[in-house]
């Protein structure tokens, strides 16, 4: 007797797998601005309110939010429905901006990874009790030609991996491991970098003084030992 074929139901793990749909935030914002302009022509809504909203949508801050949200959406690792992913992305975006309170807002900078490197140096880290910063933009390098990175930018994440509170070597390893391109989330805090560099310079100065004092002590000991050796001979 022929048995009817049975199609097994998807497992719970299969049901939770979702395809991440690409965002269309740029297009959505452009469409919103277009609708605002049409409303302005109709005269149904006070012009000053429409202009204020349009100004917000076109602001650098709104652009930064859009870029960070899109970056979080692409890199965050969650399973579940699109609504759940959207909530997780929103929370991660809010957390990124909350962490930068009192400083410049976060930015997303993407650089191509070539044989010549990325064209910048980093300093700081957990072992130095400081954030990780872009300390130098190499003249003529990839970062300078791209123009999106600044000396004084604090490095928040590399290709979706947070480096806040991490050791210096962790950030260096992530940068070296990147292939084709690297996406950085940074925020501009030059005053903090200046304070950190000043602290490091004090430590270097103190270390040089200790080395000089040690050298002087060694020379004095040698001078004291020479007369004793001459007397014994």
UniProtKB/Swiss-Prot annotation:
Pfam families named in the record: L27, PDZ
Residue ranges annotated for the PDZ domain, each copy included: 108-190
Segments carrying motif Kinase interacting site: 14-28
BP GO annotations: exocytosis; inner ear development; neurotransmitter secretion; protein transport; synaptic vesicle transport
SUPFAM superfamilies on file: L27 domain (SSF101288), PDZ domain-like (SSF50156)
Free-text tissue specificity from the UniProt record: Expressed in the kidney, along the length of the nephron.
Keyword line: Cell junction, Cell membrane, Exocytosis, Membrane, Postsynaptic cell membrane, Protein transport, Synapse, Tight junction, Transport
Gene3D superfamilies, per the entry: 2.30.42.10, L27 domain
Membrane topology category: Peripheral membrane protein
Domain of life according to the entry: Eukaryota
Entry domain remark: The kinase interacting site is required for proper delivery of ERBB2 to the basolateral membrane.
Entry's family note: Belongs to the lin-7 family.
Name the UniProt record assigns to this protein: Protein lin-7 homolog A
